């Protein structure tokens, strides 16, 4: 690590036991950027706890965020699943602390894949081993590390802004991202991606403010027509190249 980078690290995490902190920091994945801003902030809190040596805090934090996420998804999308057989199991809940019910619901509603389900099941196991008394020795460091890897993976699978996200057209127009049309009616996408998205046409522009914020501007008129993603990409590329 370069000297200035090390200085920034120690400013953030402190100089006491900095070598051990640095080793822990290197050993875990960095928090992904989520379309839900609070997820990124909470993952950073979990990371800080782990790096500082607060292993139990980091592990329980990872488990709590996992529970928070399946509650957010179920409670905000359930009205779209009134006709689904699983709706009867969750429609009265103000919150859900039954992990099996939460995970089963996400799987039944096709919100999570088999791989994400496996991560959730394993995080549930870690939660039970952590929260409920175990009359045995527990090595919290590998448990906390695994918990962080699992919750980072869950957030990445569901909310990450990146090329692996099937909901997003990633840089088909260089440097730009768009929600794919085929997913616009998916309840999960409508609830969690739409609030972070802006409806634009292919002639929109992006302006930078003095405070380094970006403003999307689009006062253009467009034909009242429905176009495909491929056609939008073609029009946008042509417009951007002028």
Q: Predicted segments — roles?
A:
Residues 4, 13, 34-37, 94, ...:
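Alpha-helix boundary/N-cap detector
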Residues 33, 110-183, 203-217, 222:
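Charge-enriched, short contiguous segments at helix-coil
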Residues 42-45, 61, 126, 150:
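Short, hydrophobic/aromatic alpha-helical segments in well-folded domains
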Residues 182-242:
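Intrinsic low-complexity, glycine/proline- and repeat-rich
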Residues 69-121, 125-129, 165-166:
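Flexible secondary-structure boundary motifs
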Residues 46-47, 51-75:
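Short, hydrophobic, well-ordered secondary-structure elements
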Residues 1-55:
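Charged alpha-helical initiation segments
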């Amino acid at each position: 690590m370069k000297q200035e980078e090390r200085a920034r690290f120690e400013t953030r995490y402190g100089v006491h036991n900095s070598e051990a902190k640095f080793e822990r920091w290197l050993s875990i994945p960095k928090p992904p950027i989520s379309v839900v801003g609070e997820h990124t902030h909470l993952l950073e809190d979990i990371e800080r706890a782990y790096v500082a040596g607060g292993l139990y805090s980091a592990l329980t934090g990872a488990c709590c965020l996992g529970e928070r996420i399946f509650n957010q998804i179920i409670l905000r999308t359930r009205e779209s699943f009134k006709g689904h057989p699983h709706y009867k199991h969750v429609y009265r809940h103000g919150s859900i602390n039954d992990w099996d019910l939460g995970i089963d619901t996400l799987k039944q509603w096709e919100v999570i894949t088999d791989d994400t389900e496996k991560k959730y099941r394993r995080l549930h196991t870690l939660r039970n081993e952590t929260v409920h008394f175990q009359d045995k020795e527990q090595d919290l460091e590998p448990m906390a590390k695994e918990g962080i890897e699992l919750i980072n993976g869950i957030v990445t699978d569901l909310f990450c802004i990146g090329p692996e996200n099937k909901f997003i057209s990633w840089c088909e127009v260089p440097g730009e991202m768009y929600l794919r049309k085929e997913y616009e009616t998916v309840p999960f996408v409508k609830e969690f991606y739409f609030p972070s998205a802006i409806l634009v046409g292919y002639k929109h522009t992006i302006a930078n403010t003095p405070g380094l914020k970006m403003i999307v501007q689009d006062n253009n008129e467009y034909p009242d027509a429905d176009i495909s993603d491929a056609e939008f990409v073609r029009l946008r590329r042509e417009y951007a190249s002028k």
